[in-house]
Amino acid sequence: ELYVEQWSNALCEKRKHLDVLGVGAYEKGKLIGLAGCSADCDTMWQIGVDVQPEYRRQGIASALTSKLALEVLAWDKVPFYCCAWSNIKSARNAIKSGFRPAWVEMTVKSREFVDEMNGGK
């Protein structure tokens, strides 16, 4: 069963009917990384990736993301990758894998809210 917490960026159990393609990285038969994509619309498939903690910082996420993006293109779909800008590791993976920022989502919060989040300063 792949619909578990450790693969929650690559696959989405609540929307498993949209998961259409995946690629994995293995070491000695053990799945150590997984990239999956969901058909969020007819023409564009979203890529998500997870790598087991002990295998991170070895280029596995980028290799999986890049490979899956090429596979998506072979299906005549547009691959896309979403992450929060605060998730710096994920944003770096996207850029390393050949993606470029196309849009940015912003959230506005009151100054009081921000001050409280910053320790009441």
Question: Where are the regions that the model predicts?
Answer:
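Conserved acetyl-CoA-binding loop-helix of GNAT-fold acetyltransferases
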Residues: 57-71, 92, 96
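Conserved GNAT acetyl-CoA-binding A-motif
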Residues: 72-84
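Conserved glycine-rich acetyl-CoA-binding loop
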Residues: 44, 52-63, 88
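Short, highly charged C-terminal tails/helix-capping segments
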Residues: 85-93, 98-99
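Conserved catalytic-core motifs of GNAT/GCN5-like acyltransferases
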Residues: 100-117
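A conserved beta-strand-loop-helix scaffold within acyl/acetyltransferase catalytic domains
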Residues: 14-44, 49-52
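Short amphipathic alpha-helix that is part of the acyltransferase structural core
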Residues: 1-14, 121
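Long alpha-helical, hydrophobic tracts
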Residues: 31, 53, 70-74
